[in-house]
Amino acid sequence: MSRSLAIEGQLRPADAKPNALRRNGKIPAVLYGPTIESSISLVVDTRAAELLVRDARPQKTPIQLSIPDLPWQGTVVLQEVQAHPAKDTLYHLSFLAKAEN
C-alpha cells in the first residue's frame, strides 16, 4: 500500500455506553501494546473507521494514530475488527501500538 493511513481518536468518556456512541456516529476502540502501561479506551469517527477498515489489512498495515487528548501519537496496526454479523456495521476496533513508539 503506497499511501499512508491515519486516524484520530478521542478518549472515551467513562460513562459512555457503546450503543449510544454508535448512534452518535462514533465507534468504541481500544489502544494497547508493549509501550503502553494500561489499555486506553477510545472513540473514533464511524466514517473514518469504515474507510480505515476498507483500506487496511488487519495486523499488517501501519496506521498513524493521533489522540489530541493525550501526548501520545504513533504507529499502530489494526489488531481486531468486530462487526455486526447481519447488519455489517462496525462494533469495535482494537489497535496495537508498535514497539518503536
Swiss-Prot record:
Pfam families: Ribosomal_L25p. Keywords: Ribonucleoprotein, Ribosomal protein, RNA-binding, rRNA-binding. The keyword RNA-binding applies. GO terms for molecular function: 5S rRNA binding; structural constituent of ribosome. The keyword Ribonucleoprotein applies. GO terms for cellular component: ribonucleoprotein complex; ribosome. CDD domains: Ribosomal_L25_TL5_CTC. InterPro entries: Rbsml_bL25/Gln-tRNA_synth_N (IPR020056), Ribosomal_bL25/Gln-tRNA_synth (IPR011035), Ribosomal_bL25_short (IPR020055), Ribosomal_L25_dom (IPR029751). Disulfide bonds: none annotated. It comes from the Bacteria. GO terms for biological process: translation. Part of the 50S ribosomal subunit; part of the 5S rRNA/L5/L18/L25 subcomplex. Contacts the 5S rRNA. Binds to the 5S rRNA independently of L5 and L18. This is one of the proteins that binds to the 5S RNA in the ribosome where it forms part of the central protuberance. Belongs to the bacterial ribosomal protein bL25 family. NCBIfam families: PRK05943.1 (NF004612). This is Large ribosomal subunit protein bL25. It comes from Thermosynechococcus vestitus (strain NIES-2133 / IAM M-273 / BP-1).
